[in-house]
């Protein structure tokens, strides 16, 4: 059984947030608290150590008491850049990733992905959501083995940043969650208002 203590949680807060006008999304107020706090609160009981991937406002993020890891590639290279530094800093056998702007992330995310991982063997298990009869991949919500660093480094060296293409090189599986809203994220000011109003 994969215990929470053997999983490091990585909160991805290193994006450019162009559709939000370049504002650091992790620090945007959601019900009067920064979004990063919602991510921490929903993840902290599911994992052991927590890391925050951020590329600006480092002091503010560090103030939450968790190590902050910055991308090693320039220009806000996307979630795989965050995965890479998270894997390098990970000291447990597994790494669970989640974005900072999904304040309703499932409270059983780690447990369900870990159960599927044990059913494998798999290199990586990611979440999918069911909405209107369709299944949608949610690849930034994933549990991966911490020994994937070499694979990811080789992939990034090719200049590819597409998360789905890296997944195709691995033995992966997915877990379908019925609550699509659990993966709702904030990409625009309008989406922020809608999500706040829904709670």
Swiss-Prot record:
GTP binds at residues 12-14, 25, 53, 71, 101. GO terms for cellular component: cytoplasm. It comes from the Bacteria. It is found in: Cytoplasm. One of its GO terms (molecular function) is molybdenum cofactor guanylyltransferase activity. Its cofactor is Mg(2+). Keywords: Cytoplasm, GTP-binding, Magnesium, Metal-binding, Molybdenum cofactor biosynthesis, Nucleotide-binding, Transferase. SUPFAM superfamilies: Nucleotide-diphospho-sugar transferases. InterPro entries: MobA-like_NTP_Trfase, Molybde_CF_guanTrfase, Nucleotide-diphossugar_trans. Its EC number is 2.7.7.77. It holds the Pfam family NTP_transf_3. CDD domains: MobA. It catalyses: Mo-molybdopterin + GTP + H(+) = Mo-molybdopterin guanine dinucleotide + diphosphate. Mg(2+) binds at residue 101. One of its GO terms (biological process) is bis(molybdopterin guanine dinucleotide)molybdenum biosynthetic process. PANTHER family: MOLYBDENUM COFACTOR GUANYLYLTRANSFERASE (PTHR19136:SF81). Monomer. Belongs to the MobA family. Transfers a GMP moiety from GTP to Mo-molybdopterin (Mo-MPT) cofactor (Moco or molybdenum cofactor) to form Mo-molybdopterin guanine dinucleotide (Mo-MGD) cofactor. The N-terminal domain determines nucleotide recognition and specific binding, while the C-terminal domain determines the specific binding to the target protein. This is Molybdenum cofactor guanylyltransferase. It comes from Polynucleobacter asymbioticus (strain DSM 18221 / CIP 109841 / QLW-P1DMWA-1).
